Regions:
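Broad gene-expression machinery/nucleic-acid interaction feature
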Residues: 1-2, 113
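NUDIX/MutT-family hydrolases
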Residues: 2-9, 13-49, 64-69, 87-96, ...
Length: 131
């Protein structure tokens, strides 16, 4: 049996990782694994892609306020391929539960990027997700 989980990279037990000499690897650059573990990783990645495009789970991997670039980068990492910026932003706007805030991110953008947030209450009213 194999298990996978989406976790926020800022919210894991660092001590546990150090005790087991574990480390993060890029899903597209997984080193050689023993037994059927490579197959398990491929299956988990496939399931993660499905879950990330049919449920809003990815929003829990971002900070409370995020830029659309951060959201797009996350989906590109999960899917392993680039996404057209204009089409992605159009799809996000059509969701109806990703709200633009009045906050501006000046740390990762020279001009200052608008910050957004996921409105879980609005999502629960529709329970429809397709990104």
């Amino acid at each position: 049996a194999a298990y996978y989980a989406f976790i926020n990279i800022n919210e894991y037990d660092r001590q546990l990782v150090e005790e087991h000499n574990a480390y993060w690897v890029n899903i597209n650059k997984v080193p050689t694994l023993l037994f059927d573990h490579a197959e398990m990783v491929c299956k988990a990645h496939h399931l993660m892609r499905i879950q990330a495009t049919t449920t809003p789970i990815a929003f829990h991997l971002l900070p409370e306020h995020f830029t659309l670039t951060q959201l797009q980068n996350l989906y590109e990492a999960i899917n392993g391929e680039p996404i057209d910026k204009r089409n992605f932003r159009k799809r996000v706007a059509e969701l109806g539960y990703v709200e633009k805030t009045k906050l501006i991110d000046k740390l990762t953008s020279r001009r200052g990027a608008a910050l957004y947030k996921f409105n879980e209450e609005d999502y629960k009213k529709t329970l429809k997700f397709k990104l």
